Amino acid sequence: MGQKRQRDSKSSTFHAKKRKKAENATAPDSDDGWDGIVGADELNWKEVALPDHLEDAGGFFGLEEIEGVDIVRGSGNGEVKFKAVAGKPKKSILKKKAPEDENSEYDEEWSGFSDDDADRPENASSPAVEKPEKSDTKADKKSEKNADKKEAKDAKKKEAKAAKKEQKEKGSAIQHDTSINAGLSFAALQDTEEDDGADVSAWDSLGLSPEILTGLSKMKFASPTSVQEACIPQILEGHDVIGKASTGSGKTLAFGIPILEHYLEKKRDDISAEKEKKSEKDSTPIALILSPTRELAHQLSKHIGELIAQAPGVNARIALLTGGLSVQKQQRLLSGADIVIGTPGRVWEILSTGQGLIRKMQQIKFLVVDEADRLLSEGHFKEVEEILNALDRVEDGEVPGGENQASEEESDPSSERQTLVFSATFHRDLQQKLAGKGKWTGGDVMDKKESMDYLLQKLNFREEKPKFIDMNPISQMADNLKEGIVECGAMEKDLFLYTLLLYHPKHRTLVFTNSISAVRRLTKLLQTLQLPALALHSSMAQKARLRSVERFSSPSSDPSTILVATDVAARGLDIKGINLVIHYHAPRTADTYVHRSGRTARAGASGKSVIICGPDEMVGVVRLAAKVHANMANGKKLPLESLELDRRVVSRVKPRVSLASRITDANIAKEKISAEDNWLRNAAEDLGVEYDSEEFDESNGKGRGRGRGRHQKQKEVGSVSKAELAGLRAELKQLLSQRVNVGVSERYLTAGRVDIDALLRGEGNASFLGPVDPLHF
C-alpha cells in the first residue's frame, strides 16, 4: 500500500481561515457561540399589506409577519423564541443593524485649517498619523474600488445618453433633408395629398389643441356633432356636465376629447417644470369611465384609443377592466394607466383587493358615467355605489391636532374632480315596466327637474347645479329612424320574423329577444334556414361574445349577417351598417326600446325598427308609444306604423319555417335530455348509487308536480330518430333551393308580370320569384 500524502500546511491554514470567516459571517457580532435561537425583538419583521377596503381592519392595522422561522419553546419559563428553518441563512431573519464605521475618524467632515495646525512643526505631522491596520486598508481599498466602479458606470451612462441624443439630432436633420428633397418630386406631392385628412376648420371654435385637431383630421371627422359642440366647451371650462342626446350622436368623443386635452396640458406642465419621469407605480390615472356592459366598455376603449393613435404626441395609456378576462393582466395595466375604462363589477373587484389603488383613484380629475340611467337604476350594479363611496371617502388624520389639515389635503382631489354623465334617457318613468296590472303613469317623458334631482341624489357633483345639456327635449329617437309594428298570432312569430328577413336581403339585421333561451333557439332556427346568424348573450364566454361582435361588424363579412341578442347589446354598441332592428319580443321598458332602436340610424344615417307584436303584448306596445312619443306635435304622424306583409309570401314560406322549427326543437330537446342524463349519472356516481334512466323516467312521469307536461313534451320531441331528422333536412333543403313563388307560372314565365331581363341581371329581391312590393314606411 502506498503511503498517504500529507496535507500542505499552507492549504490547511487557508481552509481554517475560510471556516472561521464563514462562522463569523453567520453569527451575530455580540455572540461567538451563537446557536441560532433569538427572541422576537431581534427578528426582521415585515409589515402586513392589507387591502384598501378593509381600512384599519377593526384596529388590527399595523400587523407584522415573518417567514422562514420555527418556534422554539423554553423548557422552564415558557418564553417563546425563534430560529431559522433548515436551509435558510440564519442572518436573513435578523434585524439589519446599522453598519458601524470603523474608519469614522477618517470620514469626519473637514472644517478648515486651525491655528494649531499652523503652529505645529512639519516633521511632527507625519508621526501623528498612525498607520491603519491591514484589515482597515483592505476595507478602504474595497470601498475605493466600489466607488471607482460606480463612477465608471455613471460615466458610461452619461456617454450613452449623449450618444443617443446626438444620434436623434442627426436622424432628425437627415429626415428634414430627405423631406425637403422629397418635396421636389411630384410623386411625393401626390402621396402627401392622398394622406391629407379632412378639413377640421369647423372645430376651431372649440379651442382644441393642434394634436387633437390632427387626430380628428386623420379620422375624417370634419365637423363636431351638436352634442360635442355643446358639451366640450363646458367640460374644458371645468363644469360638471349632464349630457342627454339621442343614440349615435357622438357622446363618446364629447367626453373623450376633454380628457385627452387635460392629458396634454398636464404633459406640458410636467415638461415646463422639468419634472422627473414618474415610475408606473407612482403614476395616477386622470379619468375613470364606467360602463354597464362589457361590449360598450370595449367600444369606448377602441374609439378613444383610435384618437390617441392618430393624434401626435398623445401617449395616454388605457386600462380596460372587464369581466371574463385575466385579472392579473388588468392589474398590471392599471398600475401605469392614464385612463381607466371598465364595468363596475371588475373595477370594484380590483380596487377592493389592491393596496393603495383607492387612494390613487381618489386623485382622478374626471369621473364619467356612461349610460347613467342604467348604471344608477335601483336594484342594479351595487358595485357602482361602492365605487362612488370609495372615491368620496375622506379619512381622518391620525394626529389629533392635524385632523383638519389632513382632511383638507385628502379632500382636495375629490373637490377638483369633474363628474360627467351621459345617456339617451334619464327619466325614471321610462324604466317602469310596460306590461302588468300595476299603476301606470304616463305624461311628460323629458322632465328636466326630475332628471336633475334623480342624478343629484346618486352622484356627488362638485357644483351645486351641474350643466344640463339636452340635445333632444322633444323626442329622444333619431330623426332618420322609421318605426313600424307587425301584428301576428302568438305562435307565428318565427314565421313573421323569417318573412321580414326575406323582405330585407343584404341588410345587416339585429334581432332582440327578452331571454337567453330564445336567443339560442332563434340562432339555431335561422342557421337551419341557411341564414348567417350569430348569437350574443351574457352567458357566453367573453371571448365568444367579442368574436360574435367582431364577425357581425366586420366589413368583409356577409352583408346579410344577423345578430340575435339579448338587451346586453342594446346600449352603446356602435356598429356601422346596421339597417334593420327587429324586436322579436316587445321590450319590457320604454328606455330599453329607445336604446334598442338606437343601434340603427346612427350619425345621420337612416334605419328601421320593427316590433313583432303578439296579442298578449299589445297593451305594453300601446303604453310604449304613449311614453316615447308623448310630445309628438298634434299627432300628425302615427308613432308606430302598422306594416302589412303579403299573405301570399307568408303562406309560401310557412312549410320552410315549420320544418326548420321541428328540426331545431328536436336537436335542442336531445341536447337537454343528454345533459340532464349526464348530470344525473354523475350525481349517482358521486353518491355511490346505481342509476337507471328508464326507472327514473317512469317515476318522474307518475308525478303531478309543476313542469310535468313540459318534460313529457320535451321527451316526445326528443324521441325523433336520426333517420327522421335526415328526412326533414332533405325536405327543407329542397324547399330552400327554390325561390319563393308568388303566383308565377314556372312553365310559362312570359305569361305573367315577371321581368325576365331583371331576373337574368340579378336585379330585385333574389328570394322571390315574381313581383313583391317592398315595405315602405
From Swiss-Prot:
Give residue spans, biased composition: Basic and acidic residues.
1-10, 130-171
- Give me the gene this protein comes from: mak5
Query: Record's SUPFAM superfamilies?
Result: P-loop containing nucleoside triphosphate hydrolases
Residue ranges with Basic residues bias: 703-713
Q: Which residues form the Helicase C-terminal domain?
A: 496-646
Q: What does this protein do?
A: ATP-binding RNA helicase involved in the biogenesis of 60S ribosomal subunits and is required for the normal formation of 25S and 5.8S rRNAs.
Q: Output a single Gene Ontology CC term carried by this record.
A: nucleolus
Mention one GO molecular function: ATP hydrolysis activity
Residue interval(s) of motif Q motif: 201-229
Q: Which GO terms describe its biological process?
A: rRNA processing
What keywords would UniProt list here? ATP-binding, Helicase, Hydrolase, Nucleotide-binding, Nucleus, Ribosome biogenesis, RNA-binding, rRNA processing
UniProt lists compositionally biased (Acidic residues) regions at 101-119
Q: Which reaction does it catalyse?
A: ATP + H2O = ADP + phosphate + H(+)
Q: Which organism is it from?
A: Neosartorya fischeri (strain ATCC 1020 / DSM 3700 / CBS 544.65 / FGSC A1164 / JCM 1740 / NRRL 181 / WB 181) (Aspergillus fischerianus)
**Pfam families membership:** DEAD (PF00270), Helicase_C (PF00271)
* Domain topic, free-text comment: The Q motif is unique to and characteristic of the DEAD box family of RNA helicases and controls ATP binding and hydrolysis.
Q: What is its main location?
A: nucleus
Report the EC number(s), separated by commas if there are several.
3.6.4.13
Q: Where is this motif: DEAD box?
A: 370-373
**What is the recorded name of this protein?**
ATP-dependent RNA helicase mak5
Q: Which family does it belong to?
A: Belongs to the DEAD box helicase family. DDX24/MAK5 subfamily.
Residue limits of the Helicase ATP-binding domain?
232-444
Q: Where is this region: Disordered?
A: 1-36, 86-177, 393-417, 692-720
Q: Where in the cell is it found?
A: Nucleus, Nucleolus
Chain positions recorded as ATP binding sites: A245, S246, T247, G248, S249, G250, K251, T252
